């Protein structure tokens, strides 16, 4: 049998001639040290694996708790979530447009203002034709400033669409599932709109 070629000791890096093929230490002392190092590495690896597993299990438990908590949320919570998502999309959609009521291009805060309010026409609260970017003064301090809102609304969406909004009295009770779908859809549209604008820039 051919004698194993000389190799470097894993501990001291000195060249030596091994007695057998899987020997990587030049002396018994270095063999012991190498064995301890390997055992420590294996233990560290096992500990890391166990820690990863523990974290995965912990995350699974957190996810389960989160799902259970969401399942207990009332319908009002999901209506609010959906409205926030729709409003965010509207503000981005109308980003370069002035306030629909006053025509101002400057505002301390931009809202997504409803032509027919959510209290008067809850069935239209998510209708994008009924919601437009509006300055905080018109929306919150002038009760929507609806007279000039209507004039500009006709310019933007047409008389027929405005008539349809004004004549809609079909009350609708939004379900949790509908609100979840609206939230997801609005978030997706917002992302797509931002991406398309970034690509066009």
UniProtKB/Swiss-Prot annotation:
Region (Disordered) location: 35-64
Family: Belongs to the ninG family.
Name of the molecule in the record: Protein ninG
């Amino acid at each position: 049998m051919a004698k194993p070629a000389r190799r470097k000791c894993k501990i001291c890096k000195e060249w030596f001639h091994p007695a057998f093929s899987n020997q990587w230490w030049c002396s018994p002392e270095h063999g012991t040290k190498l064995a301890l190092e390997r055992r420590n590495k294996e233990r560290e690896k096992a500990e890391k694996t166990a820690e990863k597993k523990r974290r995965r299990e912990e995350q699974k438990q957190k996810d389960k708790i989160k799902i259970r908590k969401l399942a207990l949320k009332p319908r009002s919570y999901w209506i609010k979530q959906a409205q926030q998502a729709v409003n965010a999309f509207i503000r981005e959609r109308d980003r370069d447009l002035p306030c629909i009521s006053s025509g101002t291009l400057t505002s301390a805060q931009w809202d997504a203002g409803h032509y027919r309010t959510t209290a008067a026409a809850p069935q239209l609260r998510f209708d994008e034709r009924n919601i437009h970017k509006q300055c905080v003064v018109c929306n919150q301090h002038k009760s929507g400033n609806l007279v000039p809102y209507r004039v500009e609304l006709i310019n933007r969406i047409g008389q027929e669409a405005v008539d349809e909004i004004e004549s809609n009295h079909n009350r609708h009770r939004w379900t949790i599932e509908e609100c979840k779908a609206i939230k997801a859809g609005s978030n997706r549209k917002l992302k797509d709109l931002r991406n398309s604008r970034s690509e066009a820039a």
